[in-house]
Swiss-Prot record:
Full protein name: ATP synthase subunit beta, mitochondrial
Subcellular location: Mitochondrion inner membrane
GO molecular function, one term: ATP hydrolysis activity
Chief place where the protein resides: mitochondrion
GO BP of this protein: proton motive force-driven mitochondrial ATP synthesis
NCBIfam families: atpD (TIGR01039)
EC number: 7.1.2.2
Quaternary structure, from the entry: F-type ATP synthases have 2 components, the catalytic core F(1) and the membrane-embedded component F(0), linked together by a central stalk and a peripheral stalk. The central stalk, also called rotor shaft, is often seen as part of F(1). The peripheral stalk is seen as part of F(0). F(0) contains the membrane channel next to the rotor. F-type ATP synthases form dimers but each monomer functions independently in ATP generation.
Amino acid sequence: ATAGPASGKIRAVIGAVVDVQFEQGELPAILNALTIDQGNNQKLVLEVAQHLGENAVRAIAMDGTEGLVRGQTVVDTGAPISVPVGRGTLGRIINVVGEPIDERGPIECKQRNPIHADPPSFVEQSTEAEVLETGIKVVDLLAPYARGGKIGLFGGAGVGKTVFIQELINNIAKAHGGFSVFTGVGERTREGNDLYREMKETGVINLEGESKVALVFGQMNEPPGARARVALTGLTIAEYFRDEEGQDVLLFVDNIFRFTQAGSEVSALLGRIPSAVGYQPTLATDMGLLQERITTTRKGSVTSVQAVYVPADDLTDPAPATTFAHLDATTVLSRGISELGIYPAVDPLDSKSRLLDVSVVGQEHYDVATGVQQTLQAYKSLQDIIAILGMDELSEQDKLTVERARKIQRFLSQPFAVAEVFTGIEGKLVRLKDTIASFKAVLEGKYDHLPENAFYMVGGIEDVVAKAEKIAAEAN
């Protein structure tokens, strides 16, 4: 072997993919990081994806490939991409290769970990079921989240996934003692900037003292290589807190679909034959390798919340469909509900959770949740009749069901603290026991006399009563 690191020469550049020729016997391993010195302290990192034969490798660039020329020198680092881990990352913004992008100097860390790692073995995993209270009525009641579980937020364009994630950060990360890692994968840079400023204002990020969150970004403007790997960077930082510090970590990923999308952009350039809908043939494997690492072990837990963009509102598209298989709880945001003006636009009949089980949530919660779903389902099946014949043709019992369902539907809406600037309504956080009690009372008909408007955009049932009195006073 040679004394220094092996070096090769660029042979071809095709978009985000670079072919590099090495000397005999100096071939870098798959997933190794290669670097190209671009002058003025700029280094471009590539990751080896394929061996082409004839001592050539095909690598994916983690940044733009503008300005590269054939014959330029490429150095093999001899190891995968590694990123700083530990408390030095808290309060900082990091890119895919672990460099700070917040212009606040280098990151102080004693350790760097490779972004590719094996998932914890089956023996190490923990399987306890415990509900994570979010303070969002529709979630806590109908599709509760698991502490240390995986949660998916599914929705098309513009139905409120990012606002929902921000509300969860607001409700859980603030009340939660441990650390959080927020990973922005292929989403809007503006939203990342807003989030950072908001976290500074609320003290989640403290520039002087100890912060509670590390931010990792590879946004829409980045090349596909960065977007396909930045989720792993964020996960590596979260894994360190889980395994080395025994923490309960919150991992937010916005958006996991962009991870798949970036993989499909690169896949064609790597010469793989596409599978269904043009996705990469390795779609399920890529997703599995990522998702299996996001798990709770005996050392600590990772509770992950992932936003999943649904292309063209089609939940059967291979990308969202593959993601469904990995999750404990799914919150489906629906365009139909957002068009009714009900926010959060959660579909109460489509959202599911593994925890909605008598043995986990208890009999009362289970009965109220199923009662709410039955009422809404009955209303859904009566909607065609109402559309054709009108309300007057329904039986008295059906009329009552419809009235209650419309109240429940409105009562599932809730003002968010993070949306206060847009709505002008103060955000509300509702405790689980209050949610169960108030929906139970609505199902029992105790509030049949109140107008349905009173149930819209409020917190608990006492707010409904107050709003009803206000409506009555205005009417007189």
